[in-house]
Amino acid sequence: MIPKLLSLLCFRLCVGQGDTRGDGSLPKPSLSAWPSSVVPANSNVTLRCWTPARGVSFVLRKGGIILESPKPLDSTEGAAEFHLNNLKVRNAGEYTCEYYRKASPHILSQHSDVLLLLVTGHLSKPFLRTYQRGTVTAGGRVTLQCQKRDQLFVPIMFALLKAGTPSPIQLQSPAGKEIDFSLVDVTAGDAGNYSCMYYQTKSPFWASEPSDQLEILVTVPPGTTSSNYSLGNFVRLGLAAVIVVIMGAFLVEAWYSRNVSPGESEAFKPE
């Protein structure tokens, strides 16, 4: 408890006496969430603050307010992890992190970009559907429509989620109770399970339960991969041929220079 209080006291003194935020002397840190920034209630999330700087201490803020707990795990590698356990709706919000040098002068960094942590389940589940049936051919387009049931009179945002991706892949503000998300020029990497949700864009950041997942399958026409591979091979072979020709020219010039006798060289000199 005492080391924790001393750490916070040191940080507040650094802010009060040596805040050089924005002078560019310290790089801005990055803040990420694992396993996701959109999680159900009672789950655990790890917020990781990272910077290339060394010999620093980290601080986590929520809505601009310093969080006195949980205590970060300081690391000599320029990173700290903040473990948020048994999350409730009240834990949703905008998080940032920053750091300061442990040694004098205690320079304070800029804060990271805002990470919005959403705890789902407070609002009713939306419905996700697609206009395409079956599988989608690579290079095509997929439209996913997300529709909510609630009539809310506060600003909201729709989010498209993909299983295995730690943050929403698309965000859109609706004009009504539904919104269309588009996946353009799809590839095999776009295949997977998708869901959608919506949330309030202001505090308390209430969020809906995610919709049921919808699987998107992408087929690659036969020969497409081999054609691209062949084209790549042709390009590589062409570049290799150009390099060989240039090297050959240098070798010929070097050989000619070594085999021309001094007398022959003098013969080319003007009288």
Curated annotation (Swiss-Prot):
Residues 1-16 form the signal peptide. GO terms for molecular function: immunoglobulin receptor binding. InterPro entries: Ig-like_dom_sf, Ig-like_fold, Ig-like_Receptors_ImmuneReg, Ig_sub. Keywords: Adaptive immunity, Cell membrane, Disulfide bond, Glycoprotein, Immunity, Immunoglobulin domain, Innate immunity, Membrane, Receptor, Repeat, Signal, Transmembrane, Transmembrane helix. N-glycosylated. It comes from the Eukaryota. Its main location: membrane. GO terms for biological process: adaptive immune response; immune response-regulating signaling pathway; innate immune response; negative regulation of CD4-positive, alpha-beta T cell activation. Glycans are attached at residue 44. Disulfide bonds join 49-97, 146-196. Residues 258-271 are cytoplasmic. Residues 17-236 are extracellular. It is found in: Cell membrane. Interacts with Fc receptor gamma chain FCER1G. This is T-cell-interacting, activating receptor on myeloid cells protein 1. It comes from Homo sapiens. The gene is TARM1.
